[in-house]
Structure formats: C-alpha cells, structure tokens
C-alpha cells in the first residue's frame, strides 16, 4: 500500500501545480505564494485574530505539539501567521504549534518523504484534488465524524462538500480563488468586439479577432474543466464508471480543433495559468480567467498591460458555472494529535481568521459569515477593488470542480491526455476518448 501511495502522491503533486495556494489554473510563479499581500488591511486583519483566539479552545489538556504545514506562505505572510499561532497558543497554553512552510518546489518530495518515513504532519494545507488522492489511500481523518457540529457549521455547504466522498468529508475548506475575467480593453477595441460572456460567444469571435489583432482572444480551459463547464458528465451517477466518452465530447474536441488547426486559438498549454499570464502580459492574449490575486503579478511584470485591464465575470459554458479552486486543511490519520489538530485547523479556517487573511490578499473565504462581509464589495474605485467585487459575484455561480471520488488527480490527468493526443498530437478524437475512458475506469476499479 505504501508503495502505491507514494506513486499516487507523486502524480498528485503534479496536479498541485494547477491549484496550489491562490493562483489560478496552472501557476508556478504566483500560485504557491497566495500572491503578494495587500498593504491595506494587514493591520486590521492581525488585530481581528486576537479577538477570537479565546473561543478556539482545544479540549486537549496534556502538552501537545501540532505540526502545521502550509505551501509557500511564509515569504509574504510570516507576520500574519505568527500572530495567529501566538494567539492560539496563548488561549491554549498546553498546545505548541510547529509551523512548517514547505517551498513550492519541494511539495512533492517533502510530502512523499513524510509519508514514507512515518513522520506525517498533523495539519496540512492541500488542494482538493490532492486531498482526494490521499482519501483513496485511507490516509485522512473523516472530519464529518471527527469534528463537532459547531466546527462543521461555519462553512459554505458547496465548499464543505468539495472533499466529500459518500457520507464522509475529509477537509476543512480554507480559502478559495474564484475565477474572474481580466481583459485587455485596447485589444478588444482593436478587434472591434466587446468582452464575450460565454465560450460559445468567444469562439464565434475568435477568428475575426485573431485576424484583426494577431492576438488570441482566449486560451481554452483544460479539457477536464471544459467537460464540466459544458455539462458533459465525467462519471456515471454512482461514480463507478466513466461517462464522458460521448458524441458530445467528440463534438466538443472537434469544435475546438477546428480553431487550433487554423491557428486562431493556441494548440498547447490549455488551462495553464502561467502560460496565459505570459501571453496576456506580452499583449498576445486578450482574456485571462484567473483569481484576483493575479493582478499583483501583472502589475509588477507588465505595468503597461495592467493599465489596459477591465474585469468581468469569467467565460462559462452551458452550465453557467465557473471554477473556484479551493485550498483546504486536512488532518492525516497518521497524526498522533488528531483532536488538537482538528481544533487548530478549525481555528485557522474560522470566520474571523479567514476574513483577516482575505484582507491581506485577493482571495475569498469558505465560511458563510465571512463571505457576506461588506469588505468584498465596498471598494470599486480601484482595479483591485473591482476584482474583489467581481470575485464575490462570480463565487455565487462557481464551484470547486470536485468529482467526490478518491484519486481525482489521476482521473483528471487521464482525461486531459485525450486533449493532448487529439489536439496536440493529431490522433483520432474518438480513439483518444476511448483510451481515456479505459484509463479512468481502471482508476475507479482500483478505488474500490
């Protein structure tokens, strides 16, 4: 089992690239750092944490050390988290928090080493896909059973259910990064179009726009996401078999291939946040769908492009739903301090502390009360404020694209291979989908 766990972790760690921390679709540069902190709001956020620490009491009375892993947050948020931890330790003098911030490039090796060596941390920051991979190996605590009703009640239901398998839930949702649209107003004007609202509208305008501007209108989403956005079921109702190998999926790939073959849309790097940002910053792409935190990178790397940006809701398919990548806190079964770990993870993700974190960086909370705070819609004078308000709006019709099955990362990778085979390599579309179907069914069978 351990050998299989390590191999799956290695694959799942690749998927972390797409969702690590709060940065969009495939980010390495920005996604591991929760972007840069906003100088405004930092002081108020730190202050707010001290008022809630006393309510986050652990029931543990014996001295205990909780090891808490985050992914590349210390560089920009060390003061914030040190204050959170200090307040918690003051309220719980028997609990010591050992914060370990794992560098982005070391996520895979450190996690694999910890699992193999029996030195698992107590609370770990993971995206939903990687969490579900660990669920497939029976490696995480079922928080639906282990957490109290009070602890569970604070979260937005759809986000609480992101790491749900059957009746079990394996993660406390932490912060989300709802996709919004950034678009280059000058390119739109040059192309003689207004920002499209849907993928179909974008496709209708893509060829003329490319001919008029020599830029791409948009970079297609990764194939797995496109299926969900276009209401093509990934799995059957009981989630035991693949269901995506349909004529609708064939037609979807054929439609996009007709544009990539003409060079109207990019053929490679579908769904890559980093590639999209590079093209956008160089004036070769008009639309980027990403979280509000991406503005910091664009402003630093391409200030002239930053000045052209307007925001809108993201492109959507027939479902009208957009992506809302979620970061979570999980408690490994290997933790020797599960009760204390659950209490601390719930504290980090409670209303006050999530709202405080959101005031330092452009992310969105997973708790009901925090998400309704006027902070997210009160400032629309700045581009960052407009992005925050748009994130709040987009979050109402967004979701973490979770299948609710173990080993989602491997399933996602298998499905995306159909795009690589057919669009990039030019293989037969039907054959590529058939192979992906067989691969997914094999993964699902191994989950049983």
Where is each model-derived feature located?
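Bacterial lipoprotein signal-peptidase II cleavage site
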Residues: 19-42
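Conserved C-terminal helix/tail region of periplasmic/extracytoplasmic solute-binding proteins
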Residues: 36, 47, 189, 396-448
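Extracytoplasmic/periplasmic substrate-recognition and gating elements
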Residues: 86, 90-91, 254, 258-265, ...
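Extracytoplasmic "Venus flytrap"/periplasmic binding protein-like
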Residues: 87-155, 162, 186, 190-197, ...
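Hinge/lid segment of periplasmic solute-binding proteins
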Residues: 103, 127-180, 203, 209-211, ...
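Periplasmic solute-binding protein
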Residues: 134-139, 158-194, 219-239, 253, ...
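Glycine-centered hinge/linker elements that transmit conformational signals in sensory
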Residues: 206-210, 241-269
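Long, aromatic- and glycine/proline-rich binding clefts that accommodate carbohydrate-like moieties
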Residues: 312, 360-413, 421, 447
């Amino acid at each position: 089992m351990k050998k299989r766990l390590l191999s799956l972790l290695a694959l799942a760690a690749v998927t972390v690239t797409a969702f690590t921390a709060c940065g969009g679709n495939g980010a390495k540069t920005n996604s591991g750092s929760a972007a840069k902190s906003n100088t405004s709001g930092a002081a108020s956020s730190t202050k707010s944490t001290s008022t809630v620490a006393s309510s986050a009491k652990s029931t543990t009375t014996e001295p205990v050390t909780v090891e808490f892993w985050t992914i590349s947050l210390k560089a920009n948020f060390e003061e914030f988290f040190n204050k959170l931890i200090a307040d918690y330790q003051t309220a719980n003098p028997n609990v010591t928090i050992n914060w370990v911030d794992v560098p982005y490039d070391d996520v895979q090796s450190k996690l694999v080493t910890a699992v193999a060596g029996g030195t698992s941390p107590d609370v770990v920051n993971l995206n939903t896909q990687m969490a579900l991979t660990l669920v497939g190996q029976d490696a995480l605590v079922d928080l639906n059973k282990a957490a109290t009703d009070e602890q569970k009640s604070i979260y937005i239901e759809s986000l609480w259910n992101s790491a749900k398998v059957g009746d079990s839930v394996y993660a406390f949702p932490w912060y989300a990064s709802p996709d919004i649209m950034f678009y280059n107003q000058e390119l739109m004007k040059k192309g003689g179009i207004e920002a499209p609202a849907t993928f179909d509208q974008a496709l209708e305008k893509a060829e003329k726009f490319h001919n008029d501007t020599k830029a791409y209108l948009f970079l297609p989403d990764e194939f797995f996401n496109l299926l969900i956005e276009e209401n093509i079921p990934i799995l059957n109702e009981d989630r035991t078999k693949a269901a995506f190998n349909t004529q609708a999926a064939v037609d979807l790939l054929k439609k996009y291939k007709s544009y990539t073959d003409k060079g109207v849309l990019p053929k490679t790097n579908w769904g890559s946040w980093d590639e999209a940002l590079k093209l956008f910053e160089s004036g070769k792409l008009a639309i980027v769908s990403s979280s509000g935190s991406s503005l910091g990178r664009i402003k630093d790397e391409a200030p002239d492009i930053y000045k052209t940006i307007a925001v809108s809701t993201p492109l959507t398919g027939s479902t009208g739903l957009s992506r809302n990548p979620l970061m979570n806190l999980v408690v490994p079964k290997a933790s020797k301090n599960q009760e204390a770990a659950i209490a601390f993870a719930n504290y980090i993700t409670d209303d006050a502390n999530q709202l405080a974190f959101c005031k330092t960086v452009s992310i969105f909370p997973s708790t009901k009360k925090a998400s309704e705070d006027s902070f997210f819609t009160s400032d629309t004078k700045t581009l960052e404020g407009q992005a925050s308000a748009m994130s709040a709006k987009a979050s109402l019709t967004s979701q973490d694209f979770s299948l609710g099955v173990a080993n989602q990362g491997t399933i996602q990778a298998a499905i995306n291979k159909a795009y690589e085979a057919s669009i990039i390599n030019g293989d037969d579309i039907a054959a590529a989908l058939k192979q992906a179907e067989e691969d997914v069914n094999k993964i699902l069978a191994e989950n049983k």
